[in-house]
UniProtKB/Swiss-Prot annotation:
Reactions listed under catalytic activity: N(6)-carboxybiotinyl-L-lysyl-[protein] + acetyl-CoA = N(6)-biotinyl-L-lysyl-[protein] + malonyl-CoA
Residue ranges of every copy of the CoA carboxyltransferase N-terminal domain listed in the record: 226-590
UniProt keywords, alphabetically: ATP-binding, Chloroplast, Disulfide bond, Fatty acid biosynthesis, Fatty acid metabolism, Lipid biosynthesis, Lipid metabolism, Membrane, Metal-binding, Nucleotide-binding, Plastid, Plastid inner membrane, Transferase, Zinc, Zinc-finger
Domain of life where this protein originates: Eukaryota
Main location per the UniProt record: plastid
Family named by the database record: Belongs to the AccD/PCCB family.
GO-annotated molecular function: acetyl-CoA carboxylase activity; ATP binding; carboxyl- or carbamoyltransferase activity; zinc ion binding
Activity regulation (record text): Activated by reductants such as dithiothreitol (DTT), and by thioredoxin in vivo, following exposure to light.
Record EC number: 2.1.3.15
UniProt name for this protein: Acetyl-coenzyme A carboxylase carboxyl transferase subunit beta, chloroplastic
Organism in which the protein naturally occurs: Pisum sativum
Region (Disordered): 292-357
Cofactor binding remark: Binds 1 zinc ion per subunit.
Cofactor(s) needed: Zn(2+)
Amino acid sequence: MINEDPSSLTDMDNNIDSWKNNSENSSYSHADSLADVSNIDNLLSDKIFSIRDSNSNIYDIYYAYDTNDTNITKYKWTNNINRCIESYLRSQICEDIDFNSDICDKVQRTIIILIRSTNDTNDISDTNDISDTNDTNDTNAIYDPFDISDTNDTNEIYDPFFILDINDTNDTNDIYGIYDPDDIYETNIKDICERYSEIYPRNREKSTFVPIDYSDPNCMEKLARLWVQCETCYGLNFKQFFRPKMNICEHCGEHLKMSSSDRIDLLIDRDTWNPMDEDMVSVDPIKFDSIKELGSEEESSKDRLDEDMLSPDPIELDSEEESSKDRVDSEEEKDQSYIDRLDSYQEKTGLPETVQTGTDQREEIHPLFEDIMNQLDLYLQTAKNRVDSEEEKDQSYIDRLDSYQEKTGLPEAVQTGTGQLNGIPLALAVMDSEFIAGSMGCVVGEKITRLIEYATNLLLPLIIVCASGGARMQEGSLSLMQMAKISSALYNYQINQKLFYVAILTSPTTGGVTASFGMLGDIIIAEPNATIAFAGKRVIEQLLNKEVPEGSQSADLLFDRGLLDAVVPRHLLKEFLTELFQFHGFVPLT
C-alpha cells in the first residue's frame, strides 16, 4: 500500500517472488509489491508512504532518490526497499539509515528513513519472517547495519548518531514532522571512529549533545547525577538502569552499595511492609560536642602555660629601641626580592668580590627560583583551602545527624519492621551505610532490640541485613553497650525460644556489628566480595604499620575458611531465602 496518486498504484501481488528473476533472491519474501515499475518516476520526489506486508504490519517510510540517471529498474527498486524493511525488522526500533546504494551507480544516492511502525510489532509472525532462513541465501540482498565484513563499498556508512530535529517548527510546509529531510547530515567521512564534531559539523548548533568539560571542578558532580562509578573496575553505570539491575555493575558484576529502602523493596513483597519505631531519633547522650569544646579549651590553656614557662627573662632582652629596629629590618627583608636581598647581605657581610655571585649567574638563577617559589605558594594555598574545607565539614554531632537525615531521608541508620517474603511473614532489620557509615548508636541498638523482642513474642523468623562501620564513637561507651544488649535479646530468641535468625552481611560489615549480632546468625549469608572484618583495612595499616593483603577481608575468603554458610548473589537472594525458610518449616500464608 502506497500513499500516492491512485494512478501510480497497480494490482498488488502478495508475493514478491516474481521479482527474483534477476539472479537474486529477495531478503524479505513476504512483503507486498510496492508499485509497478513503469510508474516509478512518480516516486522520485521526496515522499512519505506506507508499506504493508502480508501479516498486515504497516510501516511508514521516507524515500528520496537523488540521481542524475533516472533509469531505475525493478531490480534496484526492490533491493533498496527490501533492505530497508529488513534492517527495520532486525533492529525493532525507530532507526535512521543513510547509505549509498552499492548496486546503483556511484553518482546515485539513496536515502531511506524508517519512521515508525503504525501497529503492534510484537506479532510473532514478524519474528518468524525475520528468522526465515530460506530467504537469506543471498547475503548481498540483506543490509545489516551491524555487519562490518562487507568492505567492497567504502562509501557505505551506517549512521548511529542521528539526532532528531525537534526545534524546526517554523516551516509550515514541513510534512515530515520531526524527521525533517532538510536536516539529514551529508557526510563522506569513511572513518566511523572520527570525532562527533568532525562527523556532524552542519547541525551542531541545533544538536542537543552537550560536551563535558573535564577541567570544570564541578564535572564529577554533574556526572554523578547521571552515572554511578564502580569502585572496582571504575566503569560508569547509567543511573536510570542502575536500580532495576539491583546496583550490580554491568561491566564487572560487582555488588555496589544499596540503600536500606532498596533492600526492603528487594526482599519484601509489595504492600506488605509495616515499619516500626520510625519516630525514634538520636540525641547527644554524652554531650559529645561539649566534651570536645572542653578538651580544646584545656589544650589552649596548657599551650599558653607552656609558652609562659618557656618565655625568656625580660631582663635579658636588648633595649626597646634595638628590638623595634630589628623588627623593622626583618619586615623590610621580607618585602625585598631575591636579588635585592643578595645585594644587601653582601653589603652587610662585606664578602669579597670573588665570593659574591656574578650578575650573569644571578640573572640565570632568578627565573628558576621565582618559578619554584610560585609553585610553593600555589601548593600552600591549595593546602590551606583543603584545611578550610575540612574545617567546614567538622560539624557538631547534632548538625551531622540533621544533615544525614536530610540527605538519606531516614531518621537513623537502620530500618526495622515486619513484612512478607514470598508470602512468609517475618521480622526484618536493614542497616544503611549511607547514614554516618551505618554506625551503631543507642537508637540503632534500641530499634534492633525491640524488633527481636517483637519477633520473639510473635514467633516470627528474623532477618538482619548488616551494613555498618561499627559502634558510633560520638556516643562513647553507650554505643558499645548496644552490642551486649542485642546479643542478650538474640540469646533469648535463639536459645530459649528456638527461633530462626538469618544474618545477611553486606559491604561493609566491620567493628562492633561483626563482633556481636553479625556473626550470631543460625545461617550467615554474605554478598559476593563483601568487606567483612572486625577492624577495617585502614585502621589496621595505621595501627600496625603493615599493609593488609588484598582480599583478606572479602566474603569469598571467609567462606573458604568456613566462617560463612553461603555467598549468594543479590538477584538470587530472595528465592534462596524462600527455600531456606520453607526448609525450616515456615510456609506462606497464602
